[in-house]
């Protein structure tokens, strides 16, 4: 599958549960023309058929190369980012929950569901395949959330793109992230304020911000219906270094705060 088709399929799946993204994209298209996607991100569980290292060959099949690796100690995550030789192709960021670092109760709860994942050859459609297990109960979701918001989100939503990202560098009306976020707020969308609305600085070469996740009603086990966070839209401004080369990587401290965009509390 070529990257163009991959991202087209992803976008259609994404806006099904993130309608705010389509509205925000149209908002900027009206004044800035084509909105360029900087990167997408995914979440998964370690120690399962869907673990990060099993997904990597699929990304490589589209011509991507490994860019870097990351560790998020407090959230018990590890991650890898991937970059394509064609600079017009968005970057990809995949993280996984290191379940072995969770409490025994949380590990058992997750295993109850991830044991339902069918062992089979994976293809790129896995990235919009959602849950490979039954929906948990509301009590299980809520209990897991107390220990890992990331894990609770993943248990309910499954493997779907977590966010797309507007490349502020390619906007024509502004290159200031605060202006972009203000415009998003003026349009009625909430933004992630954890660590401040803007994560990172010009000096660190990467400034990021995001909306708070959309919310949709899901039916949990036992016919219990509850509204939960789905996915969000990110905004990234990349700056050049002293040699004039625009930074293309990711910064752990920024990403750590961006993860909070799906918090239910």
Segments from the language model and where they lie:
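Extended, well-ordered protein cores
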Residues: 1-53, 63, 67-265
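Conserved active-site alpha-helix within GNAT-family acetyltransferase domains
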Residues: 56
């Amino acid at each position: 599958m070529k990257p163009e088709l991959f991202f087209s399929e992803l976008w259609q799946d994404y806006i099904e549960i993130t309608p705010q993204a389509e509205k925000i994209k149209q908002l900027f298209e009206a004044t800035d023309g084509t909105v360029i996607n900087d990167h997408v991100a995914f979440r998964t569980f370690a120690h399962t058929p869907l673990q990060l290292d099993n997904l990597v060959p699929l990304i490589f099949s589209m011509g991507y190369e490994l860019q870097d690796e990351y560790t998020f100690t407090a959230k018990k995550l590890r991650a890898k980012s991937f970059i394509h030789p064609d600079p017009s192709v968005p970057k990809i960021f995949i993280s996984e929950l290191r379940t072995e670092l969770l409490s025994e109760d949380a590990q058992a709860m997750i295993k109850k569901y991830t044991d339902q994942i069918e062992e089979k050859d994976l293809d790129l459609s896995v990235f919009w395949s959602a849950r490979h297990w039954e929906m948990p109960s509301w009590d299980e979701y809520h209990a897991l959330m107390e220990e890992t918001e990331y894990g609770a989100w993943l248990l309910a939503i499954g493997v779907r793109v977590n966010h797309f990202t507007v490349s502020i560098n390619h906007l024509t009306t502004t290159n200031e992230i605060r202006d972009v976020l203000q415009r998003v707020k003026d349009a009625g969308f909430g933004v992630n304020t954890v660590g401040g609305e803007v994560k990172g600085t010009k000096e660190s070469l990467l400034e990021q911000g995001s909306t708070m996740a959309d919310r949709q009603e899901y039916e949990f086990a036992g016919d219990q219906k509850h509204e939960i966070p789905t996915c969000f839209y990110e905004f990234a401004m990349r700056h050049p270094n002293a040699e004039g080369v625009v930074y293309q990587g990711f910064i752990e401290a920024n990403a750590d705060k961006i993860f909070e965009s799906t918090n239910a509390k």
